[in-house]
Amino acid sequence: MRHTFEAEQWLPYRVELVFAFFANPENLPRLMPAWQKARIEEASFAPPPPRPVAADPALRIRSIAAGAGTRMTISFKPFPFSPIRVPWDAEIADFAWNDHFCDVQHRGPFAYWKHCHSVRPESRTNDRGELIEGTLLRDRLEYEMRCGAVGELAHTVVVRRQIGKIFAFRQQRTAALLPLMRPQKSVLSSTEY
């Protein structure tokens, strides 16, 4: 059975910064709980299309980005103190600068997994009535469990709630990490796209 999960987060940062943060694969382990000890095991990068040139020089962000066709294998511990690591092989299937990108699982814990990240400019009013430019970040997951009825039971009892907790954690980490984002040389590659 196919399941969906959706999450939204408004961030007081411009689309260019938010998208660049999520398009940089080095940030993925930083968005996962520390107890998972997530790490990138392998990566084969495909360059994204040329980055649009922002009118505002402050938004001309130089950072690595994983374009459509990028394949990555990450591994992580499925629960605290786990002696095993779970490999997850995924590919960026679709990529459009400052709009969206989607990744699909080729090998991993799910029978099917597609995760689309999308951004759009959205201004909000603060407590003082001032208009703040920002970005609405949307995550949409489509996934299927393995192991038939047993997998569906696990989804009902554990997995659905765990996905919600992981995305709540991601939102907290995103809010903490975005103010620290500085374009810098990648540790994965010296090539900046």
Regions inferred by a protein language model and the residue ranges of each:
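Hydrophobic ligand-binding cavity/cleft-lining segments
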Residues: 1-58, 193
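Short, surface-exposed coil-to-beta transition loops
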Residues: 4-6, 85-89, 111-116
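Generic structural detector for well-ordered beta-strands
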Residues: 8-12, 91, 118, 142
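Hydrophobic pocket/interface hotspot
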Residues: 18-22, 28, 72, 92, ...
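Short, highly charged C-terminal tails/helix-capping segments
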Residues: 40, 173-193
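Glycine-rich portal/gate segments that line the openings of hydrophobic small-molecule binding cavities
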Residues: 40-107, 126-127, 181-183
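Beta-strand/loop substructures that line and gate deep hydrophobic ligand-binding cavities in soluble
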Residues: 102-165
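Substrate/cofactor-recognition hotspot
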Residues: 170
